[in-house]
Each structure stands twice: as structure tokens, then as C-alpha cells.
Amino acid sequence: MGIESTSHTFGVGIVKYVSSINETRILANTYDKYIPEKGGIHPREAALHHARVAAKVLSDALQKANISMRDVSAIAVALGPGLGPCLRVGASLARFLSSYYNIPLIPVNHAVAHIEIGKFLFGFKDPLIIYVSGGNTLIAIQRKKRYRILGETLDIPIGNLLDTFAREIGLAPPYIVNGKHQVDICAEWGSEFISLPYTVKGSDLSFSGLLTAALSLAEKYIDNKKKLGNVCLSLRETAFNMLVEVAERSLVLAGKKEVLLVGGVASNKVLRKKLELMASLHGAKYAGTPPEYSGDNGAMIAYTGLLGYLHNVIVEPRKAFVRQRWRLDEVELPWIQD
């Protein structure tokens, strides 16, 4: 069982490992998402939401998997990175379940889990990883039992860029409508590309200048739907093209034959098409996690917890401390084969 509570989503996932045929099955992936009435995520309000829905989400997951807690052999929990109050809700529940049912507790890094669920779904062994979300934007490869970061944002993540822009110009919340981000919906109103700050430094990116410039333009055109659409279109294309550039550079330098897109922004169809085209030009196989697994979810924690369980990555409940800042490249992963 895996518990996710790093940010706006409280989720519980359950996976089953059949050792006789070396097969893993996802039995349940239930969640409840905190959606603020206005503004961004308020950590304490999100934590209160998680505490309110935890019992029901857990019960729904067990019902979906058609099992009871007595059938669960181990508990995995995302201990970071994330928002402190939110992390503590999941950690407290995991510590209680581990102690009460006397089953092992496996610590999971949230970023690692996004990658591992993607590799599992598509059978990838050694991909170039493009991780894009509201909290992360980075390019990584696996090497010497760790994920090594080749490039990353120097300021704000790409998901934060899109959400902040949509919120500041009055389009959000909600940020997603019928599977589309508000920036994508707004971009459909426009047809003209406007030059905006494009900041790439080697394999690193910077989005803050792009956000400032786009907001400045949007303020002028807030009552002109077509011109506002041009700003949205230009913001999206500039940000995504920056990401594709650093991904392509990293792909060539690392010599990988698989490209894996993970994280919440991985559900964006425009970005997926751009990266798929880039990968095909270099003869690489491309895959992006589907919407049900690209956002925060418990199944990815459960699956990564399974990997940890099979490699004896276990922590005592009293030592299962949350880590608000826990970089991807700080985690040693015994299951990675060089």
C-alpha cells in the first residue's frame, strides 16, 4: 500500500506482486484533491483537507482492491519533498498503520515515484527522464544507483509558471477544465506568436523572466480575447520549446534510446507531441505517463514502495521523518542496474 500526501492530493494506491511469475498489478489508485477557492495552495488548509478525507480514501482503496488491512504486507509513504503540513498527514497515518498492524514501513521519495511508475507502465529500462510538474522541472538519467540530474529549472518549475499565469490573469482556479489547462484553452483564442524571454543555459532553464514578461503583456490585453490568446499561445510555446531544447541536448549527450515524460504536466497534449517528435528524430522510443498516473497518486508510491520492500529499504516508524526538501539525486536506489 502506498500513501501520497505531498501537496494538493491525498491518495492511496495498492499493488500486488506475484513472485511466481514476477508480475506486478495495480489493484487500486484512489485519491481526493484539495482545490482552493482562490489563490494557490494553502499548506495548512490542504493538510486539513487530507486529514478529513484520509479514512474514506483508504477505505475506498481497500474496497477497490477487494482486500482488508490484514492482507497488506507493507506500507509505503511519500516522506518528501513537499509541503510540511501535508507530508505530516500521510506520514502520521503510515506510521500508525505500520505500528498497529506490525508491517514494514518503506520511505519513498515523491520524485523517484513519478519516474518509477512511468518506467513500470512502459517497460523502460534506461530512459532519458523529463520530469515536469508544479514543483519540479528537470532532466535526469540513471547512473550508479541514483538518478543524476543533467539539467533543471534555476527558479520556478514549468507547472508553477502555467498555474501562476492562469491565476494572475483571472482564468484559474480551476486550473484544468475537461482535461485541458486554462493556458491551453486561452491559447486557442490566439493565432499570433509574440517574442518572449527565452532563457536556456546549457541544459538548465529559467522561467521567471518569461512569466514576468507574459503577465505584463496580459495586463494590457485583459479585455481583448484574441490578443490575450496570443499571449497564452506565446507563453506556452516558448516554455515548451525551451524544455524540448534542453531535453534534445541531453538526449544526444547521454545517448539514450528511450525518452520518458513524467509528472503532472506530462498530461499536456501539446508538450507530449513536441517531445514525441523530438524523440523520433533521434530514433528514440517515447512515452508519457497517462493522466491517471502523471499527477500525484498513491499507486506510484505503492509501486516504488514495492521496489524498496524487495530490496530491504525499510525504516522504523519512529524514524520516518518527513523531508520538505529532498532532491531526486540524493536518493540511493539499490534496484537500479547500471
From Swiss-Prot:
It holds the Pfam family TsaD. Fe cation binds at residues 110, 114, 131, 296. InterPro entries: ATPase_NBD, Gcp-like_dom, KAE1/TsaD, Kae1_archaea_euk. Substrate binds at residues 131-135, 163, 184, 268. GO terms for cellular component: cytoplasm; EKC/KEOPS complex. Its cofactor is Fe(2+). It comes from the Archaea. Keywords: Acyltransferase, Cytoplasm, Iron, Metal-binding, Transferase, tRNA processing. It catalyses: L-threonylcarbamoyladenylate + adenosine(37) in tRNA = N(6)-L-threonylcarbamoyladenosine(37) in tRNA + AMP + H(+). Required for the formation of a threonylcarbamoyl group on adenosine at position 37 (t(6)A37) in tRNAs that read codons beginning with adenine. Is probably involved in the transfer of the threonylcarbamoyl moiety of threonylcarbamoyl-AMP (TC-AMP) to the N6 group of A37. This is tRNA N6-adenosine threonylcarbamoyltransferase. It comes from Staphylothermus marinus (strain ATCC 43588 / DSM 3639 / JCM 9404 / F1). The lineage of its organism: Archaea, Thermoproteota, Thermoprotei, Desulfurococcales, Desulfurococcaceae. The gene is kae1.
